[in-house]
């Protein structure tokens, strides 16, 4: 029999995060190590852990820091990386991924974290949590290391949907600005629309239409629109939020992660080249550690699914314990700030503005009625 949560941790002041222990490349042991790292750093976080209960209990028992802070949900099935989203939607009720989202849907947890199949996670999230009213396509927002004071820029969509028309890109701008405002304490985020150049005549027709829409809503939605931006601006200082479609965004983030790993590898090779370079590495060890930390993809592991009735964090399938801990920290931070509720209010107000503008004026209505 599965243990029941202690009032979802609210009595002790904890914020409960629902975690899918399965689906990651390294198995549940790494997930448990990751939540243990989070628990050690943050006494206010508790967990509902989903997967084969007997296996998970043995792993958790080895981590004293998790004593009394984990509730188990026994799930016999696992969503694999090869499973098609449509199959998971039809047959995935007994999977750890489904159960993880169900805890958020039922109000037992403030957010969900999973390393599993991205397509399946998005499909199940839309099925179980539903989209916010007014949202056509949810988006995945990620944090990209940047030269800005906050250290990161928000990029969305990072792969939820390869399609995005002008209205979708407007919604991404609104949701991305809200994420930056609540997650990074930026009162008036700067938003840029990714294009092949900054000149207004460049880009596809839908990008030009999106540019006009995002500029039109900037004042009412309390963000600054800087216009078109290029790929070089993603880690730059020109804007805080970069808006694009899921195909382009996913390519950008994967390229950035690969580049960061390559730089780290090249630096290690360079400092091993000669005795003098080894000495130089010892003298610069503090600066090198700071640089390594800034560009480490694990520190920003976790894409946020925006546009849903609940907070869902998608962790990399290859995440280690540091990456899992970063994803949990993100879920906790957003839950603590009341981000889901604020985003829902922002999207609802934007939808109302759109409806108001689309509604006919009195003269137009009379003209339509006379037809």
From Swiss-Prot:
Pathway(s) per entry: Lipid metabolism; phospholipid metabolism
Assembly notes: Homodimer. Probably interacts with PlsY.
Enzyme class, spelled out: transferase
PANTHER family referenced in this protein's UniProt entry, alphabetically: FATTY ACID/PHOSPHOLIPID SYNTHESIS PROTEIN PLSX, PHOSPHATE ACYLTRANSFERASE
Protein name: Phosphate acyltransferase
Subcellular location: Cytoplasm
HAMAP family noted in UniProt: PlsX
NCBIfam families named in the record: plsX
Originating gene: plsX
One family name in Pfam for this protein: FA_synthesis
Family as reported in the entry's similarity comment: Belongs to the PlsX family.
TM stretches of this protein: none
Job of this protein: Catalyzes the reversible formation of acyl-phosphate (acyl-PO(4)) from acyl-[acyl-carrier-protein] (acyl-ACP). This enzyme utilizes acyl-ACP as fatty acyl donor, but not acyl-CoA.
Gene Ontology MF: a single term: phosphate:acyl-[acyl carrier protein] acyltransferase activity
EC number: 2.3.1.274
Any one GO BP annotation for this protein: fatty acid biosynthetic process
GO cellular component terms, A-Z: cytoplasm
Keyword Transferase: yes
InterPro entries recorded: FA_synthesis (IPR003664), Phospholipid_synth_PlsX-like (IPR012281)
Catalytic reactions of this protein: a fatty acyl-[ACP] + phosphate = an acyl phosphate + holo-[ACP]
Domain of life of the source: Bacteria
Record keywords, A-Z: Cytoplasm, Lipid biosynthesis, Lipid metabolism, Phospholipid biosynthesis, Phospholipid metabolism, Transferase
């Amino acid at each position: 029999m599965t243990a029941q949560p202690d009032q979802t941790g609210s009595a002790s002041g904890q914020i409960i995060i629902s975690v899918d222990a399965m689906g990651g490349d390294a198995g549940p042991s790494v997930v448990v190590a990751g939540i243990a790292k989070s628990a050690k750093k943050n006494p206010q976080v508790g967990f509902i852990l989903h997967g084969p209960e007997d296996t998970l209990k043995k792993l958790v028992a080895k981590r004293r820091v998790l004593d009394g802070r984990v509730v188990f949900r026994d799930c016999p099935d696992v969503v694999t990386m090869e499973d098609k989203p449509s199959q998971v939607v039809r047959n995935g009720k007994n999977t750890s991924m489904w159960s993880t989202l169900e805890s958020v849907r039922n109000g037992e947890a403030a957010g969900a974290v999973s390393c599993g199949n991205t397509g399946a996670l998005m499909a199940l999230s839309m099925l179980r949590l539903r989209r916010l009213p007014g949202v056509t396509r949810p988006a995945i927002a990620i944090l990209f290391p940047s030269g800005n004071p906050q250290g990161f820029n928000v990029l969305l969509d990072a792969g939820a949907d390869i399609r995005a028309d002008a209205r979708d890109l407007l919604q991404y701008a609104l949701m991305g600005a809200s994420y930056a405002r609540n997650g990074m304490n930026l009162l008036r985020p700067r938003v840029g629309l990714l294009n092949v150049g900054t000149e207004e005549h460049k880009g596809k027709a839908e990008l030009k239409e999106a540019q006009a829409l995002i500029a039109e809503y900037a004042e009412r939605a309390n963000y600054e629109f800087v216009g078109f931006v290029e790929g070089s601006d993603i880690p730059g200082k020109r804007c805080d939020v970069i808006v694009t479609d899921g195909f382009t965004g996913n390519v950008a983030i994967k390229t950035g992660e690969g580049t960061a790993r390559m730089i780290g590898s090249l630096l290690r090779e360079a400092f091993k080249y000669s005795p003098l370079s080894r000495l130089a590495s010892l003298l610069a060890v503090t600066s090198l550690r700071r640089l390594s930390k800034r560009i480490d993809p694990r520190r920003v592991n976790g894409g946020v699914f925006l546009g849903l009735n609940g907070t869902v964090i998608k962790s990399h399938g290859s995440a280690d314990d540091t990456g899992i801990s970063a994803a949990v920290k993100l879920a906790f931070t957003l839950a603590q700030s009341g981000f889901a509720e604020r985003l829902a209010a922002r999207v609802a107000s934007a939808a109302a503005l759109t409806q108001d503008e689309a509604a006919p004026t009195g003269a137009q209505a009379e003209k339509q009625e006379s037809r």
